[in-house]
Amino acid sequence: MKYENFNKELEFITNERLRNNAMIILNNLPDYFFQVQAASTGKYHPSYALGEKGLIRHTKAAVCIANNLFNIYKFDEHTKDIILISILIHDGLKHGFEYQQYSKFEHPLLIGQLLNNIKNELTLTEDEIKEISTNVSSHMGKYNTNN
């Protein structure tokens, strides 16, 4: 199963229902997500995130950073779990639904579409889907667009 690339990171999600949903979402990501480097041009990510499976390493690093921040900033467990799911899938459609050579500028917005496409497989509430979609859609800050 695709989610097995993130077994350690999935253990950080304390709620079993949310963890199971994260696994379902990860399994619905395109195969390329689990093979490509984090940056198609190599410009915007550190060297550890380049090369084969770099996007996996990038995602693992982001989860690690979040867990360290959780020691400083206090969130309830549900919020932490939603943040972790968001991080795990934030670049899941980086090259679109079908692989394209370069990153899709609007890739953060595509996750919301994916979640809506598979919501019958999920036990997430509408609010949880919206929160995850919002988290992911804003992960590029001012470099993001929704037009």
Label each region the model flagged.
Residues 58, 90, 107-108, 139-140:
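Histidine-centered active-site/metal-ligand motif
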Residues 56, 77, 102-109, 126, ...:
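Short, amphipathic alpha-helical segments
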Residues 72-77, 119-126:
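Inter-helical turn/loop segments and adjacent helix faces that build the functional surface
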Residues 1-99:
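Acidic/His-rich, divalent-metal-binding segments that scaffold phosphate/diphosphate chemistry
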Residues 83, 122-147:
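Histidine/acidic-rich helix-loop-helix segments that form or flank divalent-metal centers
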Residues 62-66, 104-121:
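An active-site-proximal "capping" alpha-helix that borders the catalytic cofactor pocket
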